Structures are given as structure tokens and as C-alpha cells.
Amino acid sequence: MAKTLYEKLFDAHVVYEAENETPLLYIDRHLVHEVTSPQAFDGLRAHGRPVRQPGKTFATMDHNVSTQTKDINACGEMARIQMQELIKNCKEFGVELYDLNHPYQGIVHVMGPEQGVTLPGMTIVCGDSHTATHGAFGALAFGIGTSEVEHVLATQTLKQGRAKTMKIEVQGKAAPGITAKDIVLAIIGKTGSAGGTGHVVEFCGEAIRDLSMEGRMTLCNMAIEMGAKAGLVAPDETTFNYVKGRLHAPKGKDFDDAVAYWKTLQTDEGATFDTVVTLQAEEISPQVTWGTNPGQVISVNDNIPDPASFADPVERASAEKALAYMGLKPGIPLTEVAIDKVFIGSCTNSRIEDLRAAAEIAKGRKVAPGVQALVVPGSGQVKAQAEAEGLDKIFIEAGFEWRLPGCSMCLAMNNDRLNPGERCASTSNRNFEGRQGRGGRTHLVSPAMAAAAAVTGHFADIRNIK
């Protein structure tokens, strides 16, 4: 029987499936951070259980770390306790930890792929919703809750029901300057923020194949923002070239054998999907969200929509509420909307390719008066690479703040946050009310678009910036 990539990955990991019961899946990799793990380790301790497979468990600190100092005390009492607990737990249970002073420390979904911890064909979980990022490698990756974190630590397995399947095909080639972030925002604009609920999404089509691994990670990272369980891109030569030679990747003949298997991780011809969505890549322009969910998105050249134009009463009410929170009036051009802060970072857009794209816009320009702009590399490795290329100097010269790795202003769990009423052009993944700080107003954009907003003081079409 013809199978989708998701069905192949799922079936290959079923440990046990009794009739009328939820299947038990084997988990190949478990990524751990300081926020969702303390209670899980306490649960192990209470029952006298070890971590079943410490060699398949990798930990780092990211959510509430300071991006200005490596001092564990810098972000308050709760952050300090969570980080100290992680240090204690990893030591006690034999789990490898990339702490604040480790060169590999960084956002968990940046660190995993760059260390070769993430490989095609794997099942990967983490107590974090954006675990879907790793699906870019043709791995089944999804976020889990803290009680499930404990279950995986104890057994290296997890009960999981089968999801529905969705194919999103982006046909043709994207125009110059259009990034994975623009593509995924355009997709969510079409499906809505709940369009993928109950599904695992496979992204395909020429525009997807053309993306680098960094771009594919951006894409899969935001699958969760359309309500999907996970996102997938089938592995190909781009994937294999990225993985080859990385720290935890197979070497020599083992790598060749792995690639032979990875090449089978494609959706079979004739396999059927529960839902199919198609977009034309050439129709996608730079995207900017205007509301309070990622599906409320328009082209940079559009005007702020009028809630009255929505036929669906639920959408209309949602748009009215969003505009009131965002402090925007219907009909005004998006390019006239001024911003207060810019955040370039997060597990969506903090990799080297993202920083290069932002630096290209920032080079030889200055951050607009009254704007604070942060650039937060996704990991110690990304930071070192960017500095080797001189990107930090470009940003600093332009008036951006060059920070230490961490989740930073993506979420209000550390010192980097918006004040009430402040408007931010952000490369992160969520624009809910209060996501970046109470009363903060978030607009999601690509790294180049964020840099353009920083230097102009408002949203600007990067295609017009020479």
C-alpha cells in the first residue's frame, strides 16, 4: 500500500499497538530545556527511576537566559532556579548539558540540527511546541507536555495516536527576496491559524525544494502556527549535505548506509492525503502580520484590512478585537505603520542565513531614531560564525544591539520584552496578545523585512531598498 512520509515514519517507530489502544512509539531523540523539565526529573526521582537512554537525551538552556550576560542570576529568581535545577538534574541523571558557558549553548531547535543530533527518519520530542522545526530533516518531531517529558525520560517511548495527513504544495519558483518566512506566513494566511489542526503537514513543491535547510526549518517551525501537530519536508541532497560531518551525525560507511535509507523517506506515488493545499510561489510577496494570530497577515504593500470586509462573523469579530489591541485603523497602508522595536532572533529565524539576510539590509545604514533593534543569534555556534564573517560589526555599526544566544524577545520569560503599547517587527513565530510582553504589539516578518523596518522606522518593502 502506498504510504505518505508521515505514515512511514510513524509505522517505523511503533513499539506496540494493541487493538483499540493508542500506539506506543519509540523516541530516537529527546531534547530538554530548563522550563519544562524540572517536574519531570522530580517525578523520576520520586519513583527511583533512571533516565532510560541518557545518550539519546540532550539538554540546553534557552528560554529564560539573559542575552546580555552569562550570569545565571540575571533574569530573576524563577529563571535562576530553573537553570540550577537543570544543571543538578543533568549531572545526577547523566544527561549531556550545554549550559551558559558551553560553546554549543543556544535555542534548543537551533542547537539540535547544527550538532547533528537531528537526523532524517527519527522521532524527536521536546517539551516545547516548536519542536516541529526538526521536521525539516524528514524527522517526525513534535512538542510534548511535562508529564510526557517524564514518560520519555523513563521509557524512551510515548503513546501517540495517528494524525491526519495534509500536503501543502508551493508550486513554481519564489521571486527574488522572498524567503521561507514569507512563504510560511502566506500559507498560514491561506489556511488560517487552525487550518492544520489534527494534521501532520508535508511541505512540497519546487519552491520548497529550492529552500536551504535553514529555510526549511523556518517553514516547519511554523507548522504549529496553523494548528498542525508537526511539519515535514522529505530529505534530499540538500539535507544530506547539511548533516554530513556534524558532531553526532554518522561517519564514513555508516553515513553512506544512512543516506541509502534516508532516500526511501519519500511519500510514495499514489499515496493519498486527507487534505491538500496548493499555492503559487510567484504570487507570494513580503508578508507582515497585522493582527494577533499568524493567520492575520497581508503583503507589505497592502492596507490594513477593514473588519467589515470579512464575511464570516467570527473572523470579523476577531479582526475588530485584533485591530483594537494592535492600535491600528482599517485602510491605512501598512508601510505607514511606525515601529518602536525590532527583534531578529528566535527558533524561527536566528540561524546564520537569517543573520546574513538582515546584515545585507543593515550594511551602511543606521537604525532609525527612537528604534531599539536587537539581533540575537540562535546559538554559540551561530554567533561565532557570524562574528567570523564580520556580521556583528555590520550590525553594531548600524546601531543594532548584538546579543548572546537565547530565546530572548520571542516570549516574555526573560529581560528582553516589550513595554505596553510598544510595536515590534519580529522574526519570531507568535503574535498573540502579550506574547512579547504585556500590552506589546507584535508584527511577524522575515529577517530582511525586520532589518528594513529598523533602518526606516516603519514597515518597508525590501524589494525597494537598494
Curated annotation (Swiss-Prot):
Q: What is the top-level taxon of the source organism?
A: Bacteria
InterPro entries reported for this sequence: 3-IsopropMal_deHydase_lsu, Acnase/IPM_dHydase_lsu_aba_1/3, Acoase/IPM_deHydtase_lsu_aba, Aconitase_4Fe-4S_BS, Aconitase_4Fe-4S_dom, IPM_dehydratase_rel_enz, IPMI_cat
| Residues at which [4Fe-4S] cluster binds | 347, 407, 410
Return the cofactor note field.
Binds 1 [4Fe-4S] cluster per subunit.
UniProt-listed Enzyme Commission number(s): 4.2.1.33
Subunit details for this protein? Heterodimer of LeuC and LeuD.
What is this enzyme's catalytic activity, as reactions?
(2R,3S)-3-isopropylmalate = (2S)-2-isopropylmalate
> A GO molecular function for this record?
4 iron, 4 sulfur cluster binding
GO terms for biological process, alphabetical:
L-leucine biosynthetic process
The protein here is known as 3-isopropylmalate dehydratase large subunit
Q: Which family does it belong to?
A: Belongs to the aconitase/IPM isomerase family. LeuC type 1 subfamily.
What cofactors are annotated for this protein?
Answer: [4Fe-4S] cluster
Phylogenetic lineage = Bacteria, Pseudomonadati, Pseudomonadota, Gammaproteobacteria, Enterobacterales
